[in-house]
Amino acid sequence: WKDKFKNVEDFRRNNVNTVVRNIQKTIIETRPEVIFSISPAADMERNYNTLFADVNTWAKEGWVDVVIPQLYFATGNDATSFNLRLDLWSQYTYENHLLIGYGIYKFGDSQYGSKFQSSDDLMKQFELASAKPKVKGSVLYSAKNLVENKVGIADAVKAIYGKKVLPPYLGRTAAVLPPTPDNIRLNGADLSWGAVSNVAYYAIYKDNGKERKADLVGITQGTSFKLSEKGVYFVTSLFKNNAESEISETVSY
């Protein structure tokens, strides 16, 4: 390694970089629709100097599609706190998408301190992350702990994610949008539209009239949907990778 690198640490980082780059290359060549994600430790310095994982380079070069830092810490003012590390990871998001990893396994376990003895801090963590425009979603570790619902963490998650939403587009390039559904029509409570070629499914929304927001009512692979309550509705089409079209014309039921 001495012929090509200044030190053994750079040599090791290059080896890891090569593995990451080759994994992505293989995915693109064989299954380009597959999303390549990596979940690094929360401590960037430890990643770089101890694990030889140069996550910042992976993100800048676009070698990984999704980064999910393991922010398994309580909120606070010290360097290891959830909020300070959230700020740091949000600053170092480039070609990749950013999802946040939550350590829900710590909640209800006395060895992890007072903030993990109720769901209040988990709610606060969600609120902090939702205020970051670059954060695309959440990953909870682990499913087992969510089912156990210690200190009400499952109830907290239900409260945060009380409304239906679609999975985000996490592709490695700018999304190519499908055509917008047209010929939107109503026959009683039956909403229907013209078929769009090569899409995976359609999403039906109800306009709530507030700040240009709408609520997801349901999804279907067909071209019709039965409405259950009065309101203003529109439809979108989605590819398999969750790239979503512009909204259709609205209809009132």
Named regions from a protein language model:
Residues G188-N198:
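Conserved aromatic anchor
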Residues W1-T57, E61, Y72-F73:
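Polysaccharide-binding and catalytic clefts of secreted carbohydrate-active enzymes
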Residues E244-Y253:
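Edge beta-strands of extracellular beta-sandwich domains
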Residues D215-G222:
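Short beta-strand segments within Ig-like beta-sandwich modules, predominantly Fibronectin type-III
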Residues A175-I184:
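Proline-enriched interdomain boundary motifs that mark the N-terminal boundary
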Residues Y202-I204:
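Short beta-strand elements bearing conserved aromatic residues within extracellular beta-rich modules
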